[in-house]
Amino acid sequence: MNFFMKIHAKKYKRFSLLPICMLLIFSLTACTANVEKRYQTYIKSLIAINYLGATKDYIAASGANQEDADALYQANIDLLTDNILTYYSVNIDDAPEMREQFESLAKNIYSKVNYKVDKARKDGSVYLVDVTIYPINLFAQTSSEVTAYVDTFNNDVKAGTYNDYSLTDYETLFSQGLIDIL
């Protein structure tokens, strides 16, 4: 009887190892898929927070708090705003309300972002995520209109149209024209 029990014990161990091995394989596969999904989700949320101000997924994926998420979005908006102001040599230091309008313009521009985030894939010991962000080409798209506006504005300056304007009013008028075009 003892011999009979040993044979069944060996068979039982072999059969019990099969489900354990299968469980291990399935759990590792699920973990890998889960890790890949987390990386893809994180990248999507990072783009969405920077361009769209969508904080919910970013907070969940990164562990950041609402204040940090809002600050990240605002920093990106400030960067685009500053780039636009620098590109067009606009000085609005004395007109803070114009800064708000340029920030609103930056938010509007970024709201049109078009991007694609592919699934994450493992390459050796690292995960890679392919991201395609389609360019907005704001400056190229509006170049002819802005050039015509600047030429007209400069001709009006030469004609003395703005001689009675303060520097702040002059810069505000010029800035508003750019915002209307962009």
Residue ranges, per PLM feature:
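Bacterial N-terminal signal peptides that target proteins for export
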Residues: 6-18
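C-terminal motif of bacterial Sec signal peptides marking the signal peptidase cleavage site
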Residues: 27-30
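Subset-of-secretome marker
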Residues: 32-182
